[in-house]
Amino acid sequence: MRSLLFLVLISVCRADHLSDSYTPDQDRVIHIQAENGPRLLVEAEQAKVFSHRGGNVTLPCKFYRDPTAFGSGIHKIRIKWTKLTSDYLREVDVFVSMGYHKKTYGGYQGRVFLKGGSDNDASLIITDLTLEDYGRYKCEVIEGLEDDTAVVALELQGVVFPYFPRLGRYNLNFHEARQACLDQDAVIASFDQLYDAWRGGLDWCNAGWLSDGSVQYPITKPREPCGGQNTVPGVRNYGFWDKDKSRYDVFCFTSNFNGRFYYLIHPTKLTYDEAVQACLNDGAQIAKVGQIFAAWKLLGYDRCDAGWLADGSVRYPISRPRRRCSPTEAAVRFVGFPDKKHKLYGVYCFRAYN
């Protein structure tokens, strides 16, 4: 206790002495760098980038080194890009680079490479974007024992649409739901995509699977059959269900297409089989549900004629609401899944560009 008291007295005396002799010239800012502080910093200039299917995009990533920590740079810099799964439980390898050695993984082969705009540029360029490329990517830079990461979200311009098959509503387990979207030129939507669609006005009272395995539905106009009339608008969450046994609808996402979507002018109405053949005779294929939604949402396609689609449903897209043509709102109108032998409808075709 005596030693401690003695030290305190010395400190007070020293402080008094400094106070008496202080001048403004003695005011200094002292920067102290911790011995174990960060010596490698990775940053993304943008947390989110936007593109569309078939386009090219640059995922930004730069790193900054402390030259005093790494000396002459005998450690080779390793750059690794991975994609985070929607549930954040796994990382999927995309691209790795170390010096002259580079490796690309899976469906990214031939489509990704480093921008290399400067010595500290780890930005990744992805070409010919697919619907599956949507998501969050992690840029990791490693030098010696030091490493740091940054995350960039890749958003795709597109449209979310609810889907159920001819069997009716609530008939798809998770795996069937994912395949159903693929069959309609789409992918199963993420929560973020559904949330953005809800903010854009999507209102749908049937619960559907999302890519993370959750079951949700968007409500902009609360009403009794859809969660209650006195509830607030929002994306209703049923939670996570058994992917094999539980059955719901699905929310799909699609984007721009490289082709022409059109209503085939034909002298007569068609059965389903006649509709398929009519498109083939015109050098095209019968259109898919994802294609009619993309044409409607992204191209403003408008046609007040009900037509067959590939899944056996009959629909028509209205961008300009009017009397007898979806008078209350712009929408892709759903007629149903009629008997394929009924000769009552036209057909929508799709011709891909080479």
UniProtKB/Swiss-Prot annotation:
What does the UniProt function comment say about this protein? Answer: Stabilizes the aggregates of proteoglycan monomers with hyaluronic acid in the extracellular cartilage matrix.
Q: Which Pfam families match?
A: V-set, Xlink
Q: Which domain of life is it from?
A: Eukaryota
Q: Which UniProt keywords apply?
A: Disulfide bond, Extracellular matrix, Glycoprotein, Hyaluronic acid, Immunoglobulin domain, Repeat, Secreted
Q: Extract the InterPro entries matched here.
A: C-type_lectin-like/link_sf, CTDL_fold, Hyaluronan_bind_Proteoglycan, Ig-like_dom, Ig-like_dom_sf, Ig-like_fold, Ig_sub, Ig_V-set
Q: Which Gene3D superfamilies match?
A: Immunoglobulins (2.60.40.10), Mannose-Binding Protein A, subunit A (3.10.100.10)
Q: Which CDD domains match?
A: Ig_LP_like (cd05877), Link_domain_HAPLN_module_1 (cd03518), Link_domain_HAPLN_module_2 (cd03519)
Q: Does the keyword Disulfide bond apply?
A: yes
Propeptide spans which residues? Answer: 1-9
Question: Where does this protein reside within or beyond the cell?
Answer: Secreted, Extracellular space, Extracellular matrix
List, alphabetically, the GO terms of the cellular component aspect: extracellular matrix; extracellular space; perineuronal net; synapse
Cysteine disulfide partners in this protein: 61-139, 181-252, 205-226, 279-349, 304-325
Its GO biological process annotations read: cell adhesion; central nervous system development; skeletal system development
* Similarity comment text for this entry: Belongs to the HAPLN family.
Which parts of the sequence belong to the Ig-like V-type domain? 38-152
Cite the Link domain residue spans from the record.
159-254, 259-351
Can you provide one Gene Ontology molecular function annotated for this UniProt record?
Answer: hyaluronic acid binding
- Protein's UniProt keywords contain Membrane: no
Organism of origin is Rattus norvegicus
- Glyco sites are at 56
Designated name of the protein: Hyaluronan and proteoglycan link protein 1
Q: Which PROSITE patterns match?
A: IG_LIKE, LINK_1, LINK_2
